[in-house]
A protein has these predicted regions:
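Sec-dependent signal peptide recognition
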Residues: 2-8
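Cleavable N-terminal signal peptides
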Residues: 8-9, 19
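N-terminal signal peptide c-region/cleavage motif recognized by signal peptidases
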Residues: 14-18
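N-terminal secretory-pathway/extracellular module detecting exported/lumenal segments
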Residues: 21-90, 97-190
Length: 190
């Protein structure tokens, strides 16, 4: 009888525990999380900063019609400062058009002009990156995994992703690399 009560208590406990919470230790040690970006907030301090981890197990292809691809995945923004220590979970959907990858732009410009200027290539790559993204806030946690209240303002409009936005561009490229084992800008469409 006591054994049945204990088993029932364990089952109830298992179903009432939050399963999606994430801790800083899990982000730092689990192989499914890839550190994509690090930025020190204050170079004079030994700790603290902005860290972005990509959950490589969460990435899924939502559209596959080469040269267009769409991927959806989850990433975590870790903010560690003296006044704030949080983990923000976000879902990112990125549309990729490899007609605008850097390698394709170089290849097509060489086909049209055997000696393209570097300036023309830079202007072409900055005018359109071939990436568009949608970002949705999912949750906010403390470093030990406790859920924090969060104000959700989710704008589901797609907006172009510029190569100068290195943080988001690196996340999008890491997602592409995780699924297709090559960088987005290395693909040549002929």
């Amino acid at each position: 009888m006591v054994q049945r009560i204990l088993m029932l208590a364990l089952v109830l406990l298992a179903f009432t525990m939050p399963t999606e919470a994430i801790t800083l230790q899990e982000l730092q040690t689990s192989p499914q999380f890839k550190l994509v970006h690090v930025q020190a907030m204050n170079p004079t301090m030994e700790r603290g900063g902005l860290y972005i981890y990509l959950n490589t197990y969460s990435i899924e292809a939502t559209h596959y019609a080469p040269p267009q691809y769409s991927l959806r995945g989850t990433y975590y923004v870790v903010i560690d400062t003296d006044y704030q220590s949080t983990i923000e979970e976000k879902q990112l959907t990125v549309d990729y058009d490899t007609n605008y990858s850097l390698a394709t732009l170089i290849h097509s410009s060489r086909m049209m002009n055997p000696s393209p200027s570097t300036l023309a290539l830079i202007e072409a790559s900055e005018s359109k990156s071939g990436l568009a993204m949608t970002e949705v806030d999912v949750a906010k946690y403390t470093f030990d995994g406790a859920t924090k209240p969060m104000h959700y303002v989710n704008d589901t409009r797609k907006f172009p992703l510029n190569r100068n936005n290195t943080i988001m561009y690196d996340i999008a490229d890491a997602m592409f690399m995780s699924v297709y084992q090559q960088h987005f800008d290395d693909i040549v469409v002929q």
